[in-house]
């Protein structure tokens, strides 16, 4: 037992287990403090030294990312990244995860995930203008996964709809690896409303520290430590570690904070997210190279007899911490009270670099700021030199391993019978990972604020008008921003390096497909335990891939989130890790949103074209077709030639800006056939496609993935203009990039011919039925 001067008795081994700390950590803490920590101090170290707060396992890998660029104003280190989007406007954006809380309390876990990322945005002085989400669940044939999906979607919808921020897009995938550990990643965008970016570093010794927002309770205590450990069969007992959100308080907080920031009387701001008051005070002090003292007796609370430990580790929602001008404190408190928010001076900035906490007249914690924030432990791991043997074996897979095609039919290794290509297209369209997510996004308010250009599902990336709502300017606003979240986790599982390159490339491609220029990314690295040899190799390889792609595409990393220990343990102590899932949130700028285009065909007889790269692999390996039709997750994912990728995107964007291209859609899950079908479904128009059999297998032509490929349509009245444009630009084409006409838009049927033989003739109505009802049928 440890006995401290404040009679704080605790069992050391039990306390270390609760705080997810090691004995080595404890010895290091004693060295930093030059004494043994009391229970409150140990709890503060527990959350601040967790992976969630200090990235102790991933920090060496994150340092490789490119973080500077011509448009980047604020990179990693602040609450969110900031880029210049022109016209004296600044976009603030970030992605965060709420995986473990959503696993045990899906509604509140997802809802507070939305609330937390919104606070990161408006803490910088920006009004939130859009939310996107990237979700992963186990397959829906298991009822518990259906319940998780229902709860998470309801939570996102509830919070986003009530707070008045549109949910404009996202992605969702289903795989058994997520059955015990779903992923809930939320990305938010905001438009700066203040003259200066509001930063988090404390300034001016003696300045008051102001607490604003909701009261503090016991909900969410230890949430950061909980988020940094694996899920087990007893994780439901950790429900108190899940926060409870109130979107109506958040709405008041947004308006009050932006109002206060515009006065210039707020010196620094930090939201109370993970690790609550501990993290916000420590980071403000460290970022300002000063200290902070706090009296917990002054903190507005909603429960009686809370301990100092509970005050400091509570993750009650909708709370902020400010450093403010002393002479303006009364004006600010009055402003916040007007919005129905609690506002109380709870401390001050001090000259010594430490966080000092008082409670009931006694100092209960006194810790150097560097020990909590800057100089936190780093766990170094050895990276294996070669990929695991099971992956090397899978990379040996060849398309010739599949059954031969006879009379336009192929034998399914999964279902042990033959199917026509027409039947395969319908089967792929009905797979929940490919099918329409309409059941999900119809629950979201995507039109609130009246700036959403395309409804969810209509375009490869969301497009939002950059209208400054606080200005009473009635002139029309043309500038906009595009955003997309992407990751093919099957590819990353089979090759973390190639798969992560592909995730960056696809997110940029989606942004380019609407006519926007990719500018920067935020990423959410969802991985299993870094203590596993393979788990850390996956994380390291993924970071290398992201680094290479971001450098080549000139899309620097402005920040993000790392979520490790995403694995579940069953009653037999068998661990199931998730597929590694590095979600890329890409943002791009577009000068004129009237030029932006969607995936839908526009006019009958418009020409359909295909652009792609011969250097970028086009293969059935690692494809949706191989998994969903043949039941095999194998093969090496396609290699992407990033120079060709960049050229294809740039060429397409310029054609869109010249009003020649009227629709475009990237080829991803399911290959060319599914991309064509989706454009048909979205427009309720057909397509007649003529393909040459320049390879041995028809299923490669139809269902192969990769190749940096995009289908697009040319307005029928601009076909000569398009051909002239193409001829003028042909001289700049790399020899490995091709652009070819493959068909035209028709009325009611998707008709695909290969070498003049018809292999598909499906009415759009039948395509739509399979595509639109797959997920909703589970409810």
Curated annotation (Swiss-Prot):
Q: Does the keyword Nucleotide-binding apply?
A: yes
Residues bound to Mg(2+) 2:
120, 271
Annotated function? Part of the phosphoribosylformylglycinamidine synthase complex involved in the purines biosynthetic pathway. Catalyzes the ATP-dependent conversion of formylglycinamide ribonucleotide (FGAR) and glutamine to yield formylglycinamidine ribonucleotide (FGAM) and glutamate. The FGAM synthase complex is composed of three subunits. PurQ produces an ammonia molecule by converting glutamine to glutamate. PurL transfers the ammonia molecule to FGAR to form FGAM in an ATP-dependent manner.
Q: What is this protein called?
A: Phosphoribosylformylglycinamidine synthase subunit PurL
User: Which HAMAP family is this protein grouped with?
Assistant: PurL_2 (MF_00420)
What is the disulfide pattern of this chain? none
Q: What keywords sit in the KW lines?
A: ATP-binding, Cytoplasm, Ligase, Magnesium, Metal-binding, Nucleotide-binding, Purine biosynthesis
Q: Name one GO molecular function term.
A: phosphoribosylformylglycinamidine synthase activity
Q: Where is the active site?
A: 52, 98
Task: Give the UniProt family note.
Answer: Belongs to the FGAMS family.
Going by the record, the broad EC class of this enzyme is: ligase
User: Which Pfam families is this protein grouped with?
Assistant: AIRS (PF00586), AIRS_C (PF02769), FGAR-AT_linker (PF18072)
Q: Where, in this chain's numbering, is substrate bound? A: 97-100, 119, 243, 315-317, 563
Q: What is its EC number?
A: 6.3.5.3
Compartment(s) of residence: Cytoplasm
**Reactions accelerated catalytically:** N(2)-formyl-N(1)-(5-phospho-beta-D-ribosyl)glycinamide + L-glutamine + ATP + H2O = 2-formamido-N(1)-(5-O-phospho-beta-D-ribosyl)acetamidine + L-glutamate + ADP + phosphate + H(+)
Tell me which residues bind ATP: 55, 94, 523, 560
Q: Which Gene3D superfamilies match?
A: PurM-like C-terminal domain, PurM-like, N-terminal domain
PANTHER family, per this entry? PHOSPHORIBOSYLFORMYLGLYCINAMIDINE SYNTHASE SUBUNIT PURL
- Which InterPro entries does UniProt cross-reference here? PRibForGlyAmidine_synth_PurL, PurL_linker, PurM-like_C_dom, PurM-like_C_sf, PurM-like_N, PurM-like_N_sf
Cellular-component GO terms for this entry: cytoplasm
Q: Describe the subunit structure.
A: Monomer. Part of the FGAM synthase complex composed of 1 PurL, 1 PurQ and 2 PurS subunits.
Q: What's any GO biological process attached to this entry?
A: 'de novo' IMP biosynthetic process
Identify the pathway.
Answer: Purine metabolism; IMP biosynthesis via de novo pathway; 5-amino-1-(5-phospho-D-ribosyl)imidazole from N(2)-formyl-N(1)-(5-phospho-D-ribosyl)glycinamide: step 1/2
The positions annotated for binding Mg(2+) 1 are: 96, 561
């Amino acid at each position: 037992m440890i006995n401290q001067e404040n009679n704080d008795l605790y069992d050391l081994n039990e306390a270390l287990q609760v705080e997810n700390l090691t004995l080595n950590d404890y010895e290091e803490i004693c060295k930093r403090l030059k004494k043994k920590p009391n229970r409150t101090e140990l709890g503060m170290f527990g959350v601040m030294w967790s992976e969630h707060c200090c990235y102790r396992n991933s920090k060496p890998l994150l340092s490789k990312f490119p973080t500077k660029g011509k448009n980047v104003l604020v990179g990693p280190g602040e609450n969110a990244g900031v880029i210049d989007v022109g016209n004296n406007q600044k976009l603030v954006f970030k992605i965060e995860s709420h995986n473990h809380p959503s696993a045990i309390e899906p509604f509140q876990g997802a809802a507070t995930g939305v609330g937390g990322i919104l606070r990161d945005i408006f803490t910088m002085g920006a009004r939130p203008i859009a939310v996107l989400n990237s979700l992963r669940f186990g397959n829906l044939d298991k009822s518990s996964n259906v319940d998780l999906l229902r709860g998470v979607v309801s939570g996102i919808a509830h919070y986003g709809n009530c707070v008045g921020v549109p949910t404009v897009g996202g992605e969702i995938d289903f795989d058994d690896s997520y059955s015990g550990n779903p992923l809930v990643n939320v990305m938010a965008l905001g438009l700066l409303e203040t003259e200066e970016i509001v930063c988090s570093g404390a300034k001016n010794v003696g300045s008051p520290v102001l607490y604003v927002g909701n009261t503090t309770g016991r909900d969410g205590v230890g949430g950061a430590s909980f988020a940094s450990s694996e899920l087990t069969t007893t994780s439901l007992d950790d429900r108190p570690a899940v926060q409870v959100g109130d979107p109506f308080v958040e709405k008041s907080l947004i308006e009050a904070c932006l109002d206060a920031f515009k006065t210039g009387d707020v010196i620094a701001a930090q939201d109370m997210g993970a690790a609550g008051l501990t993290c916000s005070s420590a980071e403000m002090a460290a970022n300002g190279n000063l200290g902070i003292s706090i009296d917990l007796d002054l903190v507005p609370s909603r429960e009686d007899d809370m301990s100092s430990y509970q005050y400091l580790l509570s993750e009650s929602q909708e709370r902020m911490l400010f450093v403010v001008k002393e002479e303006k404190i009364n004006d600010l408190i009055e402003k916040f009270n007007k919005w129905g928010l609690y506002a109380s001076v709870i401390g001050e900035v001090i000259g010594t670099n430490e966080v000092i906490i008082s409670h009931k007249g006694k100092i209960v914690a006194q810790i150097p700021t560097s020990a909590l924030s800057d100089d936190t432990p780093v766990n170094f791991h050895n990276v294996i030199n070669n990929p695991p043997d099971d992956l090397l074996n899978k990379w040996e897979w060849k398309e010739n391993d599949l059954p031969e095609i006879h009379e336009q039919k192929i034998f399914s290794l999964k279902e042990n019978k033959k199917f026509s290509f027409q039947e395969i297209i319908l089967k792929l369209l009905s797979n929940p990972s490919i099918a329409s997510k309409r059941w999900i996004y119809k629950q979201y308010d995507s039109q609130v604020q009246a700036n959403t250009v395309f409804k969810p599902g209509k375009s490869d990336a969301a497009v939002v008008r950059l209208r400054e709502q606080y200005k009473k300017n009635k002139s029309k606003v043309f500038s906009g921003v595009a955003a997309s979240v992407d990751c093919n986790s099957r590819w990353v599982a089979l090759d973390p390096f190639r798969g992560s390159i592909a995730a960056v490339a696809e997110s940029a491609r989606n942004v380019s497909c609407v006519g926007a220029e990719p500018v920067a990314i935020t990423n959410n690295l969802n991985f299993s335990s870094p203590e596993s040899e393979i788990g850390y190799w996956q994380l390291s390889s993924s970071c290398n891939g992201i680094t290479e792609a971001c450098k080549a595409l000139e899309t620097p990393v402005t920040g993000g989130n790392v979520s490790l220990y995403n694995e579940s343990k069953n009653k037999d102590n068998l661990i199931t890790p998730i597929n590694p899932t590095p979600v890329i949130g890409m943002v791009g700028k577009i000068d004129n949103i009237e030029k932006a285009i969607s995936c839908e065909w526009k006019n009958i007889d418009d020409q359909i074209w295909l652009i792609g790269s011969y250097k970028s692999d086009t293969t059935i390996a690692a494809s949706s077709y191989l998994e969903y039709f043949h039941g095999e997750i194998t093969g090496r994912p396609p290699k992407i030639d990033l120079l060709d990728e960049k050229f294809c995107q740039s060429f397409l964007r310029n054609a869109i800006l010249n009003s020649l291209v009227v629709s475009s859609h990237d080829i991803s899950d399911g290959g060319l056939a599914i991309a064509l079908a989706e454009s048909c479904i979205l427009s309720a128009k057909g397509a007649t496609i003529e393909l040459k059999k320049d390879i041995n297998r028809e299923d490669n032509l139809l269902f192969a993935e990769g190749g940096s490929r995009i289908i697009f349509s040319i307005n029928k009245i601009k076909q000569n203009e398009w051909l002239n444009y193409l001829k003028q630009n042909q001289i700049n084409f790399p020899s490995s990039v091709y652009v070819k006409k493959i068909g035209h838009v028709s009325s009611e049927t998707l008709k695909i011919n290969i070498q003049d033989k018809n292999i598909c003739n499906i009415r759009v109505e039948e395509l739509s039925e399979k595509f639109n009802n797959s997920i909703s049928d589970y409810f």
